[in-house]
């Protein structure tokens, strides 16, 4: 007869501490985890920009000017946007009520997201192991156990990736996901009040609204935990009520149609295809976790991490086989359980010899992962102060376009710019003619992109260029050739010329 564990009983058994070497190893892991978290806190101060940070800054810009009708974050158009999530709405309220710059608000968001992530990992790991030392190696595995090739992508928790995305909604959502899994794991193990299940449903919807791809990962993890626990019928009924409430929240969210996103995947496949490339180089160290999952499966065929991994791997593989490459964003649903399993195997019950071998192999793998991501130090230490071999791994962040604001570009001005500048300019309040990122709700995105291409094309005549500028109400142009209707205002980094459009 199977007896469900109590609310505080971990899923897996743990080994008792054994000697000074074991204590030293635990202390070393805790110190290393503390140092990594400290490094990330210092990164928040610098807040390096090399990705989608401008998209989120632009979202806060629109919300601080109009909480009810913010419009498109990137272009001057009245469209909904999936970036207007409850979390970004709260940040918009903070920006509007305090007059803080959007980049200060993003630093506050980074602190909140990092805090949620660290505490969420601790809480969830405690549902898997009662060993006091378990959370520290688990956090290190999530950040360092990746591969010999550097990989940065929103929604993936590698150290260097997290340093560049710590202010993103994906980190906030991932932190909520770990808390969601911890809360759900305890709920399915015993008698839980209706209010708890309804709260879980609302939290599930919040994660999906804040970052849809991380919401998929959270959903797969939640499903794995329910399947592993085999809850009683009463618990399933309450779970169903929570799901219905979550769906209701998704349906009622006024800033965008959540369910319309299911038909928008075709526009995202090309940019997600790289997720299926260089898998061994990017994620090779995770194979250690796959081996650990094998041990866990041998001990318990319904182990939640094993089920979680299988669901994530299934969705990822289905995306690659069917050409739905955006499904690759579900890969963390396979990576996270494998990384956690690798860490937990060090403290799991079992033969002492196996555990001791694992305690040697895991630190070695973490050291390889740390070396791959050593360039993260460059985000808090000047490159010249780094050892040469570390400095070579550092990737210089983007400069930004603050210089345009100093030159006179104001909130709401429309700027003609190519794709790369268009990914940053809206962060300062201006619009661009075409969005720098795919926008599933902007119906004329293709037409706008074609207009930008025509404007900067060598064979386009003066009359057509002027017509494009008039059509989109352009007041500024970045780059391109001088013209009689343009007045050069300043030259920014990299020789980028800013022109004012003359009447």
Model regions and ranges:
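Active-site lumenal/periplasmic loops and adjacent helix-entry segments of GT-C-fold
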Residues: 23-31, 35-167, 171-175, 212
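Transmembrane catalytic cores of multi-pass membrane glycosyltransferases
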Residues: 52, 203-307, 324-330
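Transmembrane alpha-helices and membrane-interface helical segments
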Residues: 119, 123, 179-186, 221-230, ...
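Membrane-interfacial loop-to-transmembrane alpha-helix junctions, especially the N-terminal start
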Residues: 134-137, 193-196, 235-240, 297-311, ...
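Short hydrophobic alpha-helices at membrane interfaces in multi-pass membrane enzymes
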Residues: 184-205
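Hydrophobic/aromatic-rich transmembrane helices and adjacent perimembrane loops
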Residues: 217, 324-362
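Signature aromatic-anchored transmembrane alpha helix within multi-pass, membrane-resident enzymes
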Residues: 244, 349-376
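Extracytoplasmic
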Residues: 376-503
């Amino acid at each position: 007869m199977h007896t469900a564990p109590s609310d505080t009983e971990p899923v897996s058994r743990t080994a008792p501490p054994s000697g000074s070497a074991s204590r030293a190893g635990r202390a070393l892991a805790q110190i290393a985890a503390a140092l990594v978290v400290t490094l990330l806190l210092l990164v928040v101060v610098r807040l390096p920009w090399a990705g989608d940070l401008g998209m989120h800054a632009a979202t806060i810009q629109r919300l601080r000017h109009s909480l009810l009708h913010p419009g498109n974050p990137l272009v001057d158009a009245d469209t909904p946007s999936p970036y207007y999530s409850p979390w970004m709405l709260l940040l918009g309220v903070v920006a509007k009520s305090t007059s803080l710059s959007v980049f200060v608000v993003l630093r506050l968001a980074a602190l909140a997201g990092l805090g949620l992530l660290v505490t969420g990992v601790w809480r969830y790991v405690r549902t898997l192991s009662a060993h006091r030392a378990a959370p520290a190696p688990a956090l290190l595995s999530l950040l360092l156990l990746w591969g010999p090739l550097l990989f940065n992508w929103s929604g993936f928790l590698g150290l260097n990736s997290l340093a560049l995305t710590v202010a993103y909604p994906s980190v906030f959502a991932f932190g909520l996901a770990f808390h969601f899994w911890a809360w759900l794991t305890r709920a399915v193990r015993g008698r839980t009040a209706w209010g708890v299940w309804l709260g879980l449903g609302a939290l599930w919807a919040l994660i999906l609204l804040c970052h849809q791809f991380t919401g998929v990962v959270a959903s797969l993890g939640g499903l794995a935990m329910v399947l592993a626990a085999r809850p009683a019928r009463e618990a399933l009924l309450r779970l169903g009520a929570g799901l219905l409430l979550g769906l209701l929240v998704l349906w009622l969210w006024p800033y965008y149609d959540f369910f319309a996103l299911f038909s928008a995947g075709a526009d995202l496949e090309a940019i997600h295809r790289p997720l299926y490339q260089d898998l061994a180089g990017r994620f090779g160290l995770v194979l250690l976790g796959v081996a650990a999952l094998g041990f866990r499966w041998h001990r318990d065929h319904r182990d939640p991490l094993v089920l979680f991994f299988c669901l994530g791997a299934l969705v990822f593989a289905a995306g690659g086989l069917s050409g739905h490459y955006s499904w690759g964003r579900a890969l963390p649903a396979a990576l996270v359980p494998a990384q956690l399993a690798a860490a937990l195997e060090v403290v799991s019950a079992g033969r002492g010899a196996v555990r001791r071998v694992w305690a040697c192999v895991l630190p070695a793998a973490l050291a390889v992962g740390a070396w791959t991501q050593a360039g993260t130090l460059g985000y808090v230490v000047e490159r010249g102060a780094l050892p040469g071999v570390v400095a070579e791994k550092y990737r210089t962040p983007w400069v930004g376009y603050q210089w345009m604001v100093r030159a006179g570009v104001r909130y709401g001005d429309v700027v003609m710019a190519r794709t790369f500048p268009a990914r940053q300019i809206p962060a300062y309040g201006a619009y661009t003619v075409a969005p720098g990122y795919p926008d599933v709700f902007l119906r004329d995105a293709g037409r706008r992109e074609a207009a930008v291409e025509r404007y900067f094309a060598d064979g386009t005549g003066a009359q057509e260029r002027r017509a494009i500028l008039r059509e989109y109400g352009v007041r500024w142009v970045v780059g391109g050739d001088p013209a009689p209707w343009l007045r050069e205002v300043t030259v920014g980094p990299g020789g980028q010329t800013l022109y004012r459009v003359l009447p």
